[in-house]
A protein has these predicted regions:
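An alpha-helical appendage that flanks or caps ligand/catalytic pockets
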Residues: 123-156, 197-218
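Acidic (Asp/Glu)-rich catalytic clusters
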Residues: 32-33, 59-68, 94-101, 179-182, ...
């Protein structure tokens, strides 16, 4: 069994916010020393108890203090962002830590409705376009071409890398499981959010509908 860590950089009484982020970096270093397989950091917004708002930046810091453990986002809330920008960020991370980067994606807002609007006024529309945005992101992350009819087919995400981040779908419902199954990517159920409710149904749906992909044939 491979054990991994999810860190949220939670706030603590009397501890400066900046220190909680530095503590997260040190926790990742310690986790690697103990032999843990993955270290993922979360994305939450406008939450007084959580200082982990920018996983890609925290991952970059951790990448320079570690050498083996896989580093990931848990996750990037895609409706807030342009898929191309996310792809570029994670290709930079892949350049810094080749073969160690996991791009965990989520559809949830990671905060309240007003905060979602502040991050992206079109977040609701982008949430409805989630599958197509995942498709575009996967192409840009992997370096595969977009369909010939795509308006952005000439755009390439940089920097060039010899390896690509591993894309994961995160979720707490059947929806995320179905999207992950459709695209043939790993799925991670947020058991700690739901107390396990819905996990068996989501995982069964995922396994029964999984479409093998080149990177994950089974």
């Amino acid at each position: 069994m491979k054990l991994s860590v999810l860190a949220q950089s939670t706030a603590a009484d009397g501890v400066p916010a900046a220190q909680t982020l530095r503590d997260t970096v040190e926790l990742a270093v310690f986790a690697e020393e103990l032999g843990y397989h993955r270290f993922w950091v979360s994305e939450h917004h406008n939450h007084p108890a959580i200082n982990g708002t920018a996983p890609e930046i925290l991952m970059a810091a951790i990448s320079q203090r570690t050498s083996r453990i896989r580093l990931g986002s848990a996750g990037v809330m895609l409706p807030h962002y342009a898929p191309l920008k996310v792809a570029e960020q994670f290709r930079v991370l892949e350049s810094l830590a080749p073969g160690r980067i996991d791009l965990g994606l989520g559809r949830a807002p990671g905060g309240d409705g007003l905060t979602s609007m502040a991050l992206n006024p079109n977040a609701h529309e982008d949430a409805n376009n989630f599958p197509s945005n995942v498709r575009d992101l996967m192409a840009w992350v992997s370096g595969d071409p977009l369909p010939s009819s795509h308006p952005f087919k000439s755009i390439v995400a940089h920097p060039e890398t010899n390896t690509a981040p591993e894309i994961w779908m995160l979720g707490t419902s059947d929806y995320g499981a179905s999207v992950a199954a459709h695209f043939g990517i790993p799925y991670c159920f947020a058991h700690f959010i739901t107390d396990g409710q819905g996990v068996k149904q989501a995982l069964t749906l995922y396994r029964d509908n999984y479409q093998p992909s080149e990177r994950f044939p089974k």
